[in-house]
Structure formats: structure tokens, C-alpha cells
């Protein structure tokens, strides 16, 4: 019961309790839930099967949160397929370099294994401590800009131009107006501290799109699609010389995005010791790398940490259970 959880998670030591953990878990789920919809949409543009990625995303996120909850239990973070690195896989690897989804998943798997090996060696600490904090944070900012450009193009705010490369889209496009409305509403809700602002914005404006005929309504409940790419990764192609750059890029983004997120969380959560070292970072890095390997086997892109607010402690287990129910 509650006493057993208290004993395992050391609620008193971390100045929290069961009620706080449940609230944190629900808040975490609401913050992360949009990934369940967005990850399949992005990867589908690169040739992945939408339904297969949807199920793989749910299962990989559930497993990753479980691993973090029971192994890296002192970290107030959740894990899910990373937004940004999935766009690189879809638009850079699959569309740009013309690799198949199976080959891309193989590259994700190899990058995850490299991450896992480094996480088990002293190289991990050397890499984290040798990279300037500005670069760690800059990687996240760069990924955010990359995502913004993709989002603007999908919603129609920008369009291709053979001369200037990018031009302003059709401002009378209903899809653009709905997208802009959703974006502004999410920002307003974020400023007001409303939990789940992203998923609320997605659901509300999706409903508006369905009612106005801009979007197609496909129902509310259905059996979960099969995991199309379960153990369907192409390891041979991923180990070829032509994929070295892809594997390195995937590893680089995942490793330093994780390092930046954990450094930021550690600063707020008081997990940096007097010697400047981050407490239990080895467990956090191992959880991330193992989750990435498992996610690639299930058929989704690189799994990474989601940055949560400092007062949200270890709601990972509740997050996992809610994700399973969904």
C-alpha cells in the first residue's frame, strides 16, 4: 500500500507524499500527452505507418516512465519520444536522405546502444563536464527552431519559394487560422499556469476543425493498431559506412539534449553537489539509453527526457499507468 511506496520512494526524505505524487503524475501526463498524437503525425510524413507508430509511442513511453520511476526514482522527469529528433528522422533521414523507416529505426537502435555503452563508462562524465552549458542549452534551442519551421510549413504559415527558399503562406487558409488560434491559446494557457495546455489546445481546435469540415473525424474509440515495426529495424543498413553520419547525429542530439535537460532539472531540484557533480545522473542516463533501444525495437524514434517543473517529483509511475489506459 501507501506505506510500501513511501518506503521505496523515500517520500519523507524528498519532502513529498503520496497525494503530491499522484497530482504530479497526472500533471506530467497532461503535459506529455500531446506527444502521443504528434509523434505519429511527424514520422508518418517520413513514410512510417501512423497506427504502428501511435501504438509504439504509447508502449515505449509507458516502459520508459516505468524504468525511470523504479530505477532513476529521484529524478522529477518523464520520458517519451523526443520532439525534434523525430522531425530529423522523418524529414532529414527518410525524406532527405531517402532511407526507409526500417533503416532509420536501425540507426536509432545503434545510436541508443552507443549511448548505453557510454553511460556505463567514465566517458559519460567526461563528455558532460567538458561541454559548455551554453552549448548544451543551445542544442535544445536549435531543435526548437527546427521544429518551429516544420510547424509553420505544416500549418501553411510559410511556403516554398525557389528564390528566397521561404515565403509567407496564404493567410486566408482555414488551416492556418485554426493553427494560429491553437498556438496562441496554448501560449495564453501556459502563461496562466493551466496544466495540459498543449493537449487542451489540440483537442479543442481539432473539434473545431471537425465541426467546420476542415479536418476529417475518424471516431473516438478503436482497437489499438498493431505495432507495424516491432523488431523490424534494419541493423545491417544502420551499421554500413553510409549511415555513420546519421548514427552520430542521432547520438549527438540524444546525448546532449539529455545532458542539457538533466543539468537544467538538477539546478532547480538541488541535485548538484558541492563538488559540482550531478547526483544519480548515471541512473538517469542509463534509463534514457535503455528506453531509446527499447523504443527502436518497438518501432518509434529516439526516447528522451521531458523537462518538468521542479515541484513535480516522481509522478512517472502514475504517468505510465494513465498512458497505458489511454
Q: What residues fall within each predicted segment?
A:
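Flexible hinge motifs at transmembrane-helix junctions and intramembrane kinks/re-entrant loops
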Residues: 184-225, 251-255
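Conserved small/polar residues in nucleotide/adenosyl-binding loops
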Residues: 306-315, 325-326
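Membrane-embedded helical hairpins/re-entrant loop segments and their flanking transmembrane helices
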Residues: 14, 43-59, 249-305
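N-terminal membrane topogenic signal
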Residues: 14-26
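Short, Lys/Arg-rich, polar N-terminal cytosolic tail immediately upstream
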Residues: 2-15
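Early transmembrane hairpin of solute transport permeases
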Residues: 23-172
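Re-entrant/interfacial helical elements at transmembrane boundaries that shape
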Residues: 37-41, 80-91, 260-269, 302-309
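Helix-loop-helix junctions that connect adjacent transmembrane segments
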Residues: 160-176, 211-252
